[in-house]
């Protein structure tokens, strides 16, 4: 909760003293006897119809407030524009007792050359307060704030150190400047600690530096490349409608092109689709296929820190087994206790038991039971091709083995002869025991 004490209208008869900004005008004996704040405009008292009038006040009432008035009068003569503390004055009224106690903690902490009251202006005499009181009066430079043990004053506002710190409005009699100034650059967000507003705006940033976090993300345009029906002998045209989000594109595809349950022809008409107009047996298969073109992946991994997303729910189900450790597919070969997370891995493993080697090298015709073993083998050919000639660098594309090329060459080099010996040893695998290190077990 925040206490906001504003320098507004004065109510001397109600026991509330004046706390407005110091103003330079003469103070008559009538005002001093009445106990009015010397910094209050005379029109304020008339506007509130304060009674009794000054000529009806008794001498006892006038003497009760005389010490307070004299205190203000002395301050005007010595420190114009500043309000001193109530030191040395007796407790002549309830008002003096309340507000002198509150003021004592602040007045004692200030220097003797520049004493300040509760709501006095803080600055050299004759210099107005800095402008910039447009929206947030608390967003000002730190040099204009005054701290103390009980609280601090910011630009004519008393700020008590309570929970939920918020600054109130500025002096109601101050003119509001039109342009924004650089006070937003030195925003004192550290005063909002109790509101969990953990903003750390540096004082050296330019005006509106914190608005960089409010930038809108760059819009990406997703276009529909679905081929629309056209009359005979006319080329088909694409839809070419653009959308700002994937959700809008998918909704458009579902409603306009894929169709509802009444649609019986499940064909993908996306531009340059490799299926070539081949129909799907079910609508959900067409929907899954369209995600290949649109790039939609609506199934994210729920495990924290993973961040992977998938286009099909089946792939997500298989992926989650890597987190859970589940392996429901057991090897069907008797005596083998290997288990796998998906059926495709189990199928690849079964080639070990059946002696099937469907993965054949196109360079040396060597076969393997698992594609990973073939990939390891192809690295040998790639290294040999880089040493001998660039023609044999790609084993998948070369039709002639490097051994035959090196054997038929008229001027073989040392590298080609070494390649010839290596490949001859690989062709004589029938005479040597099989290399079990390359098997996928």
UniProtKB/Swiss-Prot annotation:
SMART domains per UniProt: ZnF_C2H2
Gene Ontology molecular functions: DNA-binding transcription factor activity; RNA polymerase II transcription regulatory region sequence-specific DNA binding; sequence-specific DNA binding; zinc ion binding
Biased composition (Polar residues): 406-429
Region (Disordered): 375-441
UniProt keyword list: Activator, Cytoplasm, Developmental protein, Differentiation, DNA-binding, Metal-binding, Neurogenesis, Nucleus, Repeat, Transcription, Transcription regulation, Zinc, Zinc-finger
InterPro entries, alphabetized: GLI-like, Znf-C2H2_ZIC1-5/GLI1-3-like, Znf_C2H2_sf, Znf_C2H2_type, Znf_ZIC
Gene Ontology biological process: determination of left/right symmetry; embryonic axis specification; nervous system development; neural crest cell fate commitment; positive regulation of DNA-templated transcription; positive regulation of transcription by RNA polymerase II
Keyword set includes Cytoplasm: yes
Pfam families named among the record's database cross-references: zf-C2H2, zf-C2H2_15, zf_ZIC
Compartments reported by the entry: Nucleus; Cytoplasm
Biased segments, Low complexity type: 383-399
Zinc finger (C2H2-type) stretch: 222-257, 266-293, 299-323, 329-353, 359-381
GO CC, alphabetical: cytoplasm; nucleus
Domain comment in the entry: The C2H2-type 3, 4 and 5 zinc finger domains are necessary for transcription activation. The zinc fingers and the N-terminus are independently important for establishing the L/R axis.
Family, per entry: Belongs to the GLI C2H2-type zinc-finger protein family.
Physiological role: Probably acts as a transcriptional activator. May bind to the minimal GLI-consensus sequence 5'-GGGTGGTC-3'. Can determine the ectodermal cell fate and promote the earliest step of neural and neural crest development. Involved in establishing left-right asymmetry in the embryo.
Record-given protein name: Zinc finger protein ZIC 3
Species, as recorded: Xenopus tropicalis
């Amino acid at each position: 909760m925040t206490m906001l004490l504003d320098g507004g209208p004065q109510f001397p008869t109600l026991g509330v003293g004046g706390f407005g900004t110091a103003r330079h005008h003469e103070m008559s004996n009538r005002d001093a006897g009445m106990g009015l704040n010397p910094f209050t405009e005379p029109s304020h008292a008339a506007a509130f119809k304060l009674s009794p009038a000054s000529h009806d006040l008794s001498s006892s009432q006038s003497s009760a407030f005389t010490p307070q008035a004299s205190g203000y009068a002395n301050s005007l003569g010595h420190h114009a524009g500043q309000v001193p503390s109530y030191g040395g004055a007796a407790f002549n009224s309830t008002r003096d007792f309340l507000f002198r106690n509150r003021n004592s903690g602040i007045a004692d902490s200030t220097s003797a050359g520049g004493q300040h009251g509760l709501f006095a202006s803080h600055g050299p005499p004759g210099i107005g307060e800095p402008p910039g009181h447009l929206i947030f009066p608390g967003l000002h430079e730190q040099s204009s704030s005054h701290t103390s043990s009980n609280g601090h004053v910011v630009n004519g506002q008393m700020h008590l150190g309570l929970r939920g710190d918020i600054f109130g409005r500025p002096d109601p009699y101050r003119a509001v400047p039109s342009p924004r100034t650089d006070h937003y650059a030195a925003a004192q967000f550290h005063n909002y600690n109790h509101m969990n507003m953990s903003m750390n705006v540096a004082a050296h940033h330019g005006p509106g530096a914190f608005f960089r976090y409010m930038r809108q993300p760059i819009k990406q345009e997703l276009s529909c490349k679905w081929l629309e029906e056209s009359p005979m002998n006319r080329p088909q045209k694409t839809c070419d409608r653009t959308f700002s989000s994937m959700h809008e594109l998918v909704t458009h595809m579902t409603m306009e092109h894929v169709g509802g349950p009444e649609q019986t022809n499940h064909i993908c008409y996306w531009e340059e689709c490799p299926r070539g107009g081949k129909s799907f047996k079910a609508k959900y298969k067409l929907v899954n296929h369209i995600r290949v073109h649109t790039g939609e992946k609506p199934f994210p991994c729920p495990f924290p820190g993973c961040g992977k997303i998938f286009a099909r729910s089946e792939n997500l189900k298989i992926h989650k087994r890597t987190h859970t450790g589940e392996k429901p597919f057991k090897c069907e070969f008797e005596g083998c206790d290997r288990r796998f997370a998906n059926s495709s891995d189990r199928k690849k493993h079964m080639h070990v038991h059946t002696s099937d080697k469907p993965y054949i090298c196109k360079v040396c015709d060597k076969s393997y039971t698992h594609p990973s073993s073939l990939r390891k083998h192809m690295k040998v050919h790639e290294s040999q091709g880089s040493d001998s000639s660039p023609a044999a660098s790609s084993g998948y594309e070369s039709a002639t083995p490097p051994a035959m090329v090196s054997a038929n060459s008229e001027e073989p080099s040392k590298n080609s002869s070494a390649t010839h010996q290596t490949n001859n040893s690989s062709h004589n695998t029938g005479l040597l025991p099989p290399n079990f290190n390359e098997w996928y077990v």
